């Protein structure tokens, strides 16, 4: 028994010697180990990517790819379109006759299909021009229907061949810059199915129905003409006279101290308040040289001058009547009391005028500045 006790005590001492204070873990060391283990576990959880974030990244990548494809397609389409446009002038140069015809047609359609768009200055300059003293026929004083002034021998007139009305060149040029019809009868410069040739141009214009209710104007070849010969145009001029309209339809006309009673034809009577513009019945003609030789822009022409205005403006009739002119046929009336209305049916050319400071034509009002 004593030996066993001694052996047990020796073993116990040996075990105590093996366990030293330095080898035993301290509380601080244990706390550090616990902290490291918790941090490693949390970092491992954060390294995992959420499925929602992954889906958003993939979706944005797909959208970016599709946008890039569309951008490339658009650039390719625009580049191809530019190449086609650049090649079209070369094709038109190969067919000059076809291209010129299309160009004239587009320009004329733009001029005549727009509502009161006016005419181009080149087209206005192509209308016949002559001096008042060159008119052959019964010579009597006539007045310009635009500026209301009497023509003098050296006045330069421009003729509208379709209706044969003539006006001072400055008056009608200003009017045609903002209107495409005659200021007196409101007739168009081109008739349907009528071939009209300008003296200044080497080609004429043919006006016809385009099938859609509009007017189609296309260039036509001008026939050969003798350079020495002159072309004869009919001219329709008139004069202003004061008038009093009676209930029975008779018109008492007075002008220059004369008074007469007659039933005036509506086709040549243009009423302007207490005055009427009466177109003469005499056959007036004028012979014009080709290309209006000798009548190119001459600034020394006598007569009433109207300043050229910007395109889109028109006359104010009441303000034009305020001009002082010793040759005028009118007494000194108040312009504000003078009415001017122009209207008419298709069967007759009767025109009546109203408006104190503007011009009303066929139900449309043209206000002056």
UniProtKB/Swiss-Prot annotation:
What InterPro entries does UniProt report for this protein, alphabetically? Znf_RING, Znf_RING/FYVE/PHD
- Membrane topology type, per the record? Single-pass membrane protein
Name of the top EC class for this enzyme: transferase
Question: Where are the annotated RING-type zinc-finger regions?
Answer: 144-186
Family named by the database record: Belongs to the RING-type zinc finger family. ATL subfamily.
Q: Where in the cell is it found?
A: Membrane
| Reaction catalyzed | S-ubiquitinyl-[E2 ubiquitin-conjugating enzyme]-L-cysteine + [acceptor protein]-L-lysine = [E2 ubiquitin-conjugating enzyme]-L-cysteine + N(6)-ubiquitinyl-[acceptor protein]-L-lysine
GO biological process entries: protein ubiquitination
Q: In which pathway does it act?
A: Protein modification; protein ubiquitination
Membrane-spanning residues: 52-72
Q: Does the keyword tRNA processing apply?
A: no
Q: Where is the composition biased (Low complexity)?
A: 341-355
Q: Which residues form the signal peptide?
A: none
Q: Which gene encodes it?
A: ATL47
Classification via PROSITE patterns: ZF_RING_2 (PS50089)
Q: What is known of its domains?
A: The RING-type zinc finger domain mediates binding to an E2 ubiquitin-conjugating enzyme.
Q: Which GO terms describe its molecular function?
A: transferase activity; zinc ion binding
Recite the UniProt keywords alphabetically: Membrane, Metal-binding, Transferase, Transmembrane, Transmembrane helix, Ubl conjugation pathway, Zinc, Zinc-finger
This chain's source organism reads: Arabidopsis thaliana
Q: Report whether Metal-binding shows up as a keyword of the record.
A: yes
What's a GO cellular component annotated to this UniProt protein?
Answer: membrane
Region annotation (Disordered) maps to 332-355
What protein am I looking at? RING-H2 finger protein ATL47
